Amino acid sequence: MGVNSSKINDKDRSILSIKEQRDKLLRYSKRLEKIEQLEIDIARKCLRDSDKRGALRALKAKKLYSGLITQTYGQLGNIEQLLSTIEFTLIQKDVMFGLQEGTNLIRQLQADMPLERVGRICNDRDEAMSYVDEVNDMLQGRMSRDQEDEIQEELDSLIREQEDEKVKDLEKPGFTPSTGVDVLPSVPLKNAIPSLDESFPKAASVSNTSSAVVIDEELRKDPVLG
């Protein structure tokens, strides 16, 4: 009975160790996904600031995280499968192999980016930008031509996305693009110039009066009519 109890305890400890590694990998993958999204946000901001090189560097770092995330979830799938199909006779072989694989992956992830660094990157933009530079240096010569092309395609996609947003802004109701020309308001004239119709009768009246005076004087001078 003591032997059976010892075997059961060994089995339980092995399964518990696998579950602990599964949980660690799951937490790590979630943090990597946050940083992956952060790199995309950094790339978008760089494009808004017309910094195409900075955007490209951020997308290269994002590519690295995407690979780590894929690798992590692959190992998580293996561990889940191992936990669901584990049997007592396979403990010494399969469980120890799973433990070793999980341990190796965790060591690799922690060597690339310690957990403490992950927390700082998530909370500090300056730290994130600094890490982007480090990753960019680390990636020199490690990416294939296909990976470089994929990164360039993603950069072009972000550029098109921002251009589409600008077009949508122009199409919004009530949007008036600036012309750079100031339009002066109309000002009513206080002392308007009188029209010809208003001034003409007065001039005619003066002219008629002057003519009557001249005719009367001529009549007085004429001895026949006077």
Swiss-Prot record:
Natural source organism: Schizosaccharomyces pombe (strain 972 / ATCC 24843)
Subunit relationships: Component of the endosomal sorting required for transport complex III (ESCRT-III).
Any GO BP annotation: late endosome to vacuole transport via multivesicular body sorting pathway
Gene name per UniProt: vps20
Similarity-based family: Belongs to the SNF7 family.
Lipid-anchored residues (N-myristoyl glycine): 2
Pfam families from the UniProt entry: Snf7 (PF03357)
Keyword field contains NAD: no
Stated name of the protein: Vacuolar protein sorting-associated protein 20
Gene Ontology cellular component terms for the protein in this record: cell cortex; ESCRT III complex; multivesicular body; nuclear envelope; vacuolar membrane
Annotated S-S bridges: none
Function in brief: Class E VPS protein implicated in concentration and sorting of cargo proteins of the multivesicular body (MVB) for incorporation into intralumenal vesicles. The lumenal sequestrated membrane proteins will be targeted into the vacuole after fusion of the endosome with the vacuole.
Keywords linked to the UniProt accession: Cytoplasm, Endosome, Lipoprotein, Membrane, Myristate, Phosphoprotein, Protein transport, Transport, Vacuole
Compartment list: Endosome membrane; Vacuole membrane; Cytoplasm, Cell cortex
InterPro entries in alphabetical order: Snf7_fam
PANTHER family the UniProt entry points to: CHARGED MULTIVESICULAR BODY PROTEIN, CHARGED MULTIVESICULAR BODY PROTEIN 6
Origin: domain of life: Eukaryota
Membrane topology type: Peripheral membrane protein
